[in-house]
């Protein structure tokens, strides 16, 4: 009952808390005071009076709006009381008051709780923080309530909120209202059920009872619900407010954006905050505003001990753990001080406020700030000027680090749990906040910096290098820096603003990929961050250096870094897009955590390992990981770090060049990406590079290639970026990691991932990018040698974007091989892979089909037979037998067949067709066995194309394997199964129709399928288009078109387009045409 009640109530309440309360709870139709209050709270309409009160509160107390609103709610609109509560704190945190002073159906707690409304509020606030801190878990505490709680969450309200609604309802203190009411057993039950329990640990305990009560007192609960329902709504509303940053990190980020970076929030209004918040806040504000000395003073104010060495204090207070913060050492400078102030302010505030805010929220904010700070730091470093202001803050890294990185470092100290996450984010949050508040520019720059950050393994050193001067200068004149910042902010703002939001946004509403990343941020990030942690500074520092780079990026002055950053710099980052995703990683700082895996930013240094971890965590590819590491470094190297780093992979490629170029590419790409959002476009740029790098790529990447590829890829990856598949990213990243990890993954992915992400992305991209992508991709895939890996991992990805992917991959294989006919090329490709002989036997292929039937790949008779078969049902049967053979043969013979299968292109068509290919019963028969493969094929078909080998496994475990390569052949591959199946029939058909297509009706022609197709192709294609002969064309069209496009892309890329296109098109179209006449009459008719 509990459940049902809870559920209904939860749902109903959430959906229409008041109505339900009143309507469903007929027991108490009239609105209770609490319900009314809830309704008011829930009400969306703006209450001028209330707003006025809130403004008054804000002005008087200097607290942020959320706090004031909450306090007002808690105080039932009593401004004076709210002021006292805000300024003095609710002493009554532990008592509750029932708004309606409802009769205590839940008499248990009602009386006592009622008395201490304030206490309840306090509790609620505290609990709210707790809930934020604890988030769901506490809420989970109540079993039944969960439904409600979850609902609350769904609503964007916290479960707690839900709870609140029931009990707390009105009170912002979720607990308070809910509690007051909830106090009663029913309330408790409800409370629990709704997640009120979340707020109070005590409630927790009670909740169990409450839950029971909830169940037992369903009636009560309902009544209460009736009463409380509004609470639910209200609580939800309120909670939502409360929970914003709390429940989701994403939300936190948004909060940060909001400025509510809890601590940071003050930044925008430092003065107010200063006034409001602990000295720290003031300090922060002052610091931001003031000169270093001021900052120092502030710092002193904040932390006398800190004042002396702000940097340390900064570090110290902020991080609790000076060491890392130190990374900011360059940052240590004055601005470091400032940072320290900021950091401290953040840290303390964060901690203090964070406590109230919620560890998670706080952390989140911090992370964001930290990431931002890092960005800023990087940014500042890179452009001292730019970051100056935030340099200070940015010193960021320090600040961010300081703020949170320090904290991060401190993480061990204070937020160790959070730290990991915080590692980047804190900055980012803060930064974000700052950025948002302070300097969108920063945000932008910030965004960019992070990627750079990663590049800079040098960490602080690097950053500091850049930074130091900057830092010093900045520290000398923080204000000027700020001004700069502001200017920058304005400057960047324009572009950045969006990015800033985007960057932050991703935190909250990243794409799933981003979210994942973000999540990774959380889970992955922990490990990563961990590494991060180790290198938090690094990361931060990295950021810093990169930051410089970043800025540099623009100038790329730090080439080394620059590249790195550049790619990142992608200011892209800046913008954002990356931000978005990639903001790239730039944004990534935060993003990095968030999504970023990627890399590239990876922080390289930072991240190599983190990335690695990340990768591991995400990808699970160990090798990749390793690679990744390498790569990462490579990336670093490639990226810019390369320079340093890791040359490893890349050293060979001149990381710098590459880096630069890559970076440039990347950057460009990134920019593209950002601009494009794109991605694909960016990819194009890299395209060339990519291609050439593909091989390299495969080398792994070679950093170079990776980089370059990556550049291109990166873009795409970025684009999809990472495609979401973080893992992919990672993995590919590892491949490319270098390049960008991100990208790399996609491309090579890679293969897999790429395919996945990229694939789809690419696919998207592919369209535009496809060529590039394809080639890159395929190169990558091949090069990567990840084909096989792709296969397994990639395959699925491939499947998703088989066509797109396939083309890319496909062309990857065949492009060079066969420029003439797609078909031949594909065939060749396949055969080459599997059968060199078949390759030459385009003719044979037909025969091959027959051969398949006969198990004789090259059998003129068979071929003839095949034709006959096509017409006669018997052949179908034969086919059926061969089918098995063919399945097996497929690999072998059929491979040949497959090669010819290109023609089977129709078959392929048929394959897709095959479903609808009525005329091809044989095909159908044939198909079924193959079909299973076929489906894979068809899914894979792109894949196959893309990853022949890998496709192979997918397509046919046995037969398709060959096919796999054949896949290149294209769709055919996928067709292959069907084609194979219908191979005989089809072969015949093919021949027949080929003849028809050829119009010469020569079997040879069919053998010369490419020629025939080629010749006929052009015509046929038209025909094909024209001939939508029923299913054939029909399916053909879909498959074929994609194939054609893909193939064509491939071909085009390969430069085989003309011939290839024709061939393929012709083969497929012809087939349809032929099918129509020959095939249809033959196979379909016969069959």
Curated annotation (Swiss-Prot):
Region Disordered: start-end pairs: 1-33, 92-234, 377-420, 440-493, 530-656, 669-794, 865-901, 1040-1087
Cell compartment(s), UniProt: Nucleus; Chromosome; Cytoplasm; Cytoplasm, Stress granule
Biased composition (Polar residues): 390-401, 570-656, 1068-1087
GO MF terms, alphabetically ordered: RNA binding
Modified residues annotated as Phosphoserine in this record: 356, 360, 410, 416, 439, 454, 467, 470-471, 477, 604-605, 608-609, 852, 859
Residues that bear Asymmetric dimethylarginine: 187, 190
Residue numbers carrying Phosphothreonine: 425
Boundaries of every UBA domain copy: 49-89
Modified residues (N-acetylmethionine): 1
Biased amino acid composition, Low complexity: 213-226, 377-389, 474-485, 534-569, 688-784, 873-896, 1053-1067
PANTHER family attached to this UniProt entry: UBIQUITIN ASSOCIATED PROTEIN 2-LIKE/LINGERER (PTHR16308), UBIQUITIN-ASSOCIATED PROTEIN 2-LIKE (PTHR16308:SF18)
Protein's UniProt name: Ubiquitin-associated protein 2-like
Species the sequence originates in: Homo sapiens (Human)
């Amino acid at each position: 009952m509990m459940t049902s009640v809870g559920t209904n109530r939860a749902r109903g309440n959430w959906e229409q808390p008041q109505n339900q309360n009143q309507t469903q709870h007929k027991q108490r139709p009239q609105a209770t005071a609490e319900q009314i209050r809830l309704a008011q709270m829930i009400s969306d309409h703006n209450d001028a009076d209330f707003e006025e009160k809130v403004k008054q509160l804000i002005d008087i107390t200097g607290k942020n709006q959320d706090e004031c609103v909450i306090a007002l709610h808690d105080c039932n609109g009593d401004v004076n009381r709210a002021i006292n509560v805000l300024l003095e704190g609710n002493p009554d945190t532990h008592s509750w008051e029932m708004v309606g002073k409802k009769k205590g159906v839940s008499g248990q707690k009602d009386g006592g709780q009622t008395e201490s409304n304030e206490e309840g509020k306090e509790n609620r606030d505290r609990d709210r923080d707790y809930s934020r801190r604890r988030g769901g878990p506490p809420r989970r505490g109540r079993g039944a309530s969960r439904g409600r709680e979850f609902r609350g969450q769904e609503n964007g309200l916290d479960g707690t909120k839900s709870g609140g609604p029931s009990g707390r309802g009105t009170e912002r203190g979720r607990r308070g209202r809910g509690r007051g009411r909830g106090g009663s057993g029913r309330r408790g039950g409800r409370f629990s059920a709704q997640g009120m329990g979340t707020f109070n640990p005590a409630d927790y305990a009670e909740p169990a009872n409450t839950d029971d009560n909830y169940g037992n007192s369903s009636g009560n609960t309902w009544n209460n619900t009736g009463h409380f329902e509004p609470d639910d709504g209200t609580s939800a509303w309120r909670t939502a407010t409360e929970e914003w940053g709390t429940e989701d990190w994403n939300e936190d980020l948004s909060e940060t954006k909001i400025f509510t970076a809890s601590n940071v929030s003050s930044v925008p209004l430092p003065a107010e905050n200063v006034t409001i918040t602990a000295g720290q806040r003031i300090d922060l504000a002052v610091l931001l505003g003031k000169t270093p000395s001021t900052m120092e003073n502030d710092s002193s104010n904040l932390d006398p001990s800190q004042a002396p060495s702000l940097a340390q204090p900064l570090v110290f207070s902020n991080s609790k753990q000076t060491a890392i913060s130190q990374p900011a050492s360059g940052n240590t400078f004055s601005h470091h001080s400032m940072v320290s102030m900021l950091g401290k302010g953040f840290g303390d505030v964060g901690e203090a406020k964070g406590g109230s805010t919620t560890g998670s929220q706080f952390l989140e904010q911090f992370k964001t700030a930290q990431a931002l700070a890092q960005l800023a730091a990087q940014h500042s470093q890179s452009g001292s000027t730019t970051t100056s202001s935030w340099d200070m803050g940015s010193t960021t890294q320090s600040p961010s680090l300081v703020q949170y990185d320090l904290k991060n470092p401190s993480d061990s100290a204070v937020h160790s749990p959070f730290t990991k996450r915080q590692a980047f984010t804190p900055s980012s949050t803060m930064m974000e906040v700052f950025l948002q508040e302070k300097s969108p520019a920063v945000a932008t720059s910030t965004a960019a910096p992070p990627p750079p950050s990663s590049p800079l393994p040098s960490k602080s050193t690097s950053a500091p290098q850049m930074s130091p001067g900057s830092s010093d200068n900045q520290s000398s004149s923080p204000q000027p820096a700020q001004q700069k910042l502001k200017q920058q902010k304005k400057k960047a703002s324009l572009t950045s603003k969006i990015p800033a939001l985007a960057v932050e946004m991703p935190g909250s509403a990243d794409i799933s990929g981003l979210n994942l990343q973000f999540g990774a941020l959380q889970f992955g990030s922990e490990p990563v961050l961990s590494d991060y942690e180790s290198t938090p500074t690094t990361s931060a520092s990295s950021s810093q250096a990169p930051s410089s780079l970043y800025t540099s990026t623009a100038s790329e002055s730090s080439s080394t870094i620059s590249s790195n950053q550049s790619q990142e710099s992608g200011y892209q980052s800046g913008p954002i897009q990356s931000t978005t995703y990639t903001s790239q990683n730039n944004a990534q700082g935060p993003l990095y955590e968030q999504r970023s895996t990627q890399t590239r930013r990876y922080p390289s240094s930072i991240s190599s390992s983190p990335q690695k971890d990340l990768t591991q965590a995400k990808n699970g590819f160990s090798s990749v990981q390793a690679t990744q590491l390498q790569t990462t470094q490579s990336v670093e190297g490639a990226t810019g770090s390369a320079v340093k780093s890791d040359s490893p992979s890349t050293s060979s490629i001149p990381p710098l060049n590459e880096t630069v170029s890559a970076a440039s590419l990347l950057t460009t790409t990134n920019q593209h990406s950002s601009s494009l959002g794109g991605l694909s476009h960016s990819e194009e740029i890299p395209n060339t590079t990519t291609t050439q790098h593909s091989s390299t790529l495969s080398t792994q990447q070679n950093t170079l290639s990776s980089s370059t590829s990556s550049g291109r890829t990166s873009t795409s990856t970025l684009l999809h970026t990472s495609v979401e598949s973080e893992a992919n990213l990672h993995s590919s990243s590892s491949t490319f990691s270098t390049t960008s990890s991100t990208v790399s993954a996609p491309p090579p992915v890679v293969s897999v991932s790429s395919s996945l992400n990229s694939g789809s992305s690419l696919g998207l991209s592919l369209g535009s990018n496809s060529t590039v992508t394809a080639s890159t991709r395929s190169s990558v895939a091949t090069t990567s040698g990840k084909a096989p890996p792709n296969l397994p991992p990639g395959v699925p990805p491939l499947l998703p974007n088989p066509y797109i992917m396939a083309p890319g991959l496909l062309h990857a294989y065949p492009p060079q091989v066969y420029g003439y006919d797609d078909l031949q090329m594909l065939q060749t490709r396949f055969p080459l892979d599997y059968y060199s002989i078949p390759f030459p036997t385009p003719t044979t292929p037909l025969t091959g089909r027959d051969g398949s039937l006969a198990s004789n790949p090259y059998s003129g008779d068979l071929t003839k037979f095949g034709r006959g078969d096509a017409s006669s049902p018997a052949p179908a049967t034969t086919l059926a037998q061969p089918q098995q053979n063919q399945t097996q043969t497929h690999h072998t013979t059929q491979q040949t067949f497959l090669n010819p299968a290109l023609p089977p292109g129709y078959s392929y068509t048929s394959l897709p067709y095959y479903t609808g290919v009525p005329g091809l019963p044989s095909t159908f028969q044939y198909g079924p066995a193959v079909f299973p493969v076929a489906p894979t094929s068809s899914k894979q078909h792109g894949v196959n194309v893309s990853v022949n080998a890998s496709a192979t496994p997918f397509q046919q475990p046995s037969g398709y394997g060959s096919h796999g390569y054949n896949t290149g052949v294209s769709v055919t591959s996928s067709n292959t199964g069907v084609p194979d199946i219908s191979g005989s029939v089809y072969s015949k058909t093919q021949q027949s129709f080929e003849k028809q297509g050829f119009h010469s009706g020569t079997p040879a022609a069919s053998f010369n399928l490419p020629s025939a197709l080629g010749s006929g192709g052009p015509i046929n294609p038209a025909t094909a288009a024209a001939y939508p002969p029923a299913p054939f064309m029909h399916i053909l069209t879909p498959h074929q078109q994609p194939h054609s496009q893909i193939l064509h892309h491939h071909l085009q890329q390969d430069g085989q387009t003309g011939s290839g296109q024709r061939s393929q098109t012709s083969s497929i179209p012809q087939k349809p045409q032929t099918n129509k006449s020959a095939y249809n009459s033959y196979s379909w008719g016969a069959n």
